[in-house]
Amino acid sequence: MSPARWDLPPELCCRPMAFVALTGLDVVYNAIHRAIWDAFCANRRADRVPISFKVLPGDHEYPKCRTKRTSYEWYIPKGILKTGWMNKHLNLVPALVVLFYELDWDDPQWKEKQSECATKVEIVRTSLQGRNTKVAVVLIQKKTPLPPGEDLVASERASALCGACDLSGKSLFVLPHTDHLVGYIIRLENAFYEHAQTYYYNEIRRVKSHKEFLNKTTHQLLFVRHQFKMGFFSELKQDTQNALKYYRTAYSLVHELRAHETNVLEIKTMAGFINYKICRLCFQHNTPLDAIAQFRKHIDLCKKKIGSAELAFEHTAWMSKQFQSFGDLFDEAIKLGLTAIQTQNPGFYYQQAAYYAQERKQQAGQLCSHEPGVGYPAPDPLETTSGALDFYGQRPWRQGHQSIDPPDSEKEKQGILALQVKERDVLHSELIIALLSNAVAQFKKYKCPRMKSHLMVQMGEEYYHAKDYTKALKLLDYVMCDYRTERWWSLLTSIVCTALKCSYLMGQVKDYITYSMELVGRASILSEEQKSRIEKNLIKVLMNEVPEPEPDCDPVSVKAAQSLWSDRVSLAGNNEFTIDVQDYVPFVQCKAKFLSPSFHIDEPVQLHVYVRADCPHPVRFSKLCVSLSNQEYNQYCLLEDAYKGKDILEPSSQENMCLVPGKTRKYCFNFVAKTEDVGKKIEITSVGLMLGRETGRYVYLNWRGGWGDAASSHESLQASRSFKRRTRLPEQHVDWDAVSVQSSTMIISRVPKISVQLTHEPPALTNEMFCMTVTIKSEEDTVGKDIKLTAGLKPGQDANLTQSTQITLNGSEVCDDSHPALLPDIPLGDLQPGQKIVKPLYIRCVSTGSRIFLFHVAYSVSATVEGKDITCKCHKDETVTVETVVPFEVAMKFVSSKFEHLERVYVDIPFLLMMDILSASPWPIELVESEVQLASSMTAIDQPQSQVEGVTLQTSECASECFLLKCPPVQNGTSTVASGHYIISWKRKSTFTETSVVRTVITLPHVMVENIPLYVHAEVPSFGRVRESLPVRYHLENRTGLVQDVEISVEPSDAFMFSGLKQVRMRILPGAEQEMLYNFYPLMAGYQVLPQLNINLLRFPNISSQLLRRFLPSRIFVKPQGRNGDASIEAA
């Protein structure tokens, strides 16, 4: 029985489209006709109407229409649906026949061609005798027709042609062969589509009209048939909603049929067809839940309709095909835009289809295992006269039989036998693998890794049963990683057993060794007997012998495998294998560890390797080697059996090279590190354990990183989380779970035996030469040679700090930018035991902030390790954080002679520069000297001398000094000029060390200088006395090149009487000076306001009187009158 027998017919699975036949086109020899045909069928877009076109000759014979039945009273149907009915209406019986005929309206032979066209139409009608198929005529014309109504000749001849051909006006079309051919074709298609819809509508009505003649006693099959036909015609009409309604009715009716062994296959077949149509339309209507519900209902209704027990495999084959077909529909809908999810995707249906295919295989094995003498029956009961069945789902030897009992029991037996024999020849594994492959692809697409792995295991097992061991092993090996990672030990054991059988039957030595080691180990759930058998086979392979066959293997395959293994044994080469155990769970475990995360160069590096076996019997290894990142040390980490030629089963002279099951062996290695490895990490790259002999066959178990297989990480985690109290083991025994892994170690320098002391007085002051004394004292037993000091700013800090820090050994010189921030490798010579070296360093910090300074002392000493003389390089680092602060803050301001703040100064008018020095240092500061370097735009009235020289300031104390200055004339009326620099020489007062003088230069602020036209100043005594005359002389100096007209008035004061001009107007020549004398008579004692002088410059109205008199004193101290005037005057 061919698998194709269960495939759905292609006419059921395709999308039904209206069938339109085109006649009168010579597409081979006529280029115009070919262009018309290409426009109809080539590169059709999705938005064009769904029509299936076919070019047929004009005299084509269409299927004959049977005589219509007038009564169904005595009619008994022989089946539900004929096998050729769907194809007939899809490809054989057209809804419309279109006759193409070349004829122009102005053709000179119009009459003859009109008659010829009518004849061709009549021929088509004759061939369609009894059919309701429409006929239409398309005139192929060379000219573009005029708009309707304008060409009277065309209208008349069109009417005449319709009359001659017996056509309605809607069935006659004109097709001009112009550049716009495709546009005309699309318009024709739309018209053809309307005619086709009318045809299928009439067909539905015709089928529906039969219902009144039917009864439910004898015509149950016809009810199903008619509903199916109406649904199919509705699909051809593209009325999918009504089609779904008819199909649902048909599905209900098909399950109302009385089922028995002779017709159950036909019922299931038609139910499957109708279910397929319903599900397809539900997906098409974007109602996937309805499709799924319908399919589940379909399976529930049909899964128990098995039929003949002798043909039970047919039922499982049919069930498998149902799931596969629905999976195909689901997948097709997804490709068209439907969204699926993890829990509902086509993979589940393909998986179920594979399950039924596996059941089919199992049932076929039970039902089709005939005796060797039983062959295929003759004559063939499955042959039919036509080569095909008349009705879907019927038996070839009893077509049309609808009664409960078979007509001929002998034929029934022969037919069943023929089906069983054909089923025996079916390659079930191929069917199962194809379905599982589809399911795996879907679960991979929807990210269901466990489902994917599960099905891949089934595929591997199916390949194994199909004797395709290569593919089976490839698939099983792929999924083993997942099961190892997730620790499904029972599943993994089953998979590895199958893989072991495959590797044995293929003669794959390495795979056989690998899987044997895993099945013998702790992850396997096999019994001790099975493990023991596998271990013995493993030892045989390592001894280059042929292993015993695995149980339950195909005898023919075993025989071939034994021949393969014999060839493997006879081969001299290819006997060395390496297995990376990280991907497996072998029966040997390993942990390698350094005893410390770091070792000093003057002590040996110690390494322990722990090995444990989980196999049933003791096993001996021949070599254990540790590979380190520095391969020069590998020679010290090697354990080898001295007697390499001995047999693997013979006892070894080295007892510790035999691994006893469940007992942990410890192997110790040590070596002396090289001095050039100081500061480097040494890592365990791998540990190798050799089973077998180099003279024969051997396998290297390789642990990358020195420990661990596919199960070790989880076991270590479980052990660390366990609250189980560990039993105390004897001293010589090792608790495997208590062994931790240390796969790398650092070689560090020898512990230095020197002391480094730093002496300094923090914080550092900006720009000073900050002294830091380094004292190095030796505590070594031998001479420290080649001592070098690296001192300065610790690397890795802010780049700005590096640029603003300088260090030197010479404290007498001031550092500049040429000095580095770090002095490397300062040679200090040798250091005897107990000797001390003192080294002062001077650091200049230009900016404030916190800095970390490093003092690195390196030297070398001689030492003996494990009898080897080595030179050890030692070093000691000391760091210190030093804060840098400003020593003082300088406040500068310009004031007038009355000590009023000035925002601007005036040409040749004296003013004061005030300097306030506030100490911010926690240490006393001595001000050695100060000076003012004036710019050319400013001069001193007298020789400026330092007023703070020798002053010592404590924290927060302030020293002040002032300088009397004036500005010479400027070019413009107003300008901003530089003042110069203020230079302070200072030093820290320290009892710790002699400090150097620091010279700090401070830039004085710029000041705005203005010219003033009239300078007014006064000569006033330092004080006055009540009721005594107080002479005041005012000087008015013209500073311009113009004659100044000046108005002067005196505002009286309540505290004074005065004599002199109260109001005067005068003229002052350029550069001249005018004096005015007043006698003031004080009336009250104390600080009194002098009478104010109001000055008005007529040539400079913008100059205010207030500006001019700011240079004049406004108050004076008046003493009270004494009892003895002379004595008081002398006292004053």
From Swiss-Prot:
Keyword Transport: yes
InterPro entries registered for this protein in UniProt: TPC11, TRAPPC11_C
Subcellular location as annotated: Golgi apparatus; Golgi apparatus, cis-Golgi network
Keyword Magnesium: no
Gene knockout outcome: Pronounced hepatomegaly accompanied by lipid accumulation in the liver.
Transmembrane parts of this sequence: none
GO cellular component, one term: Golgi apparatus
Annotated GO biological process: Golgi organization; lipid homeostasis; liver development; protein N-linked glycosylation; protein secretion; regulation of response to endoplasmic reticulum stress; retina development in camera-type eye; vesicle-mediated transport
Assigned keywords, A-Z: ER-Golgi transport, Golgi apparatus, Transport
Cited PANTHER family: FOIE GRAS (PTHR14374), TRAFFICKING PROTEIN PARTICLE COMPLEX SUBUNIT 11 (PTHR14374:SF0)
Family listed: Belongs to the TRAPPC11 family.
Subunit structure: Component of the multisubunit TRAPP (transport protein particle) complex.
Task of the protein: Involved in endoplasmic reticulum to Golgi apparatus trafficking at a very early stage.
Protein name per Swiss-Prot or TrEMBL: Trafficking protein particle complex subunit 11
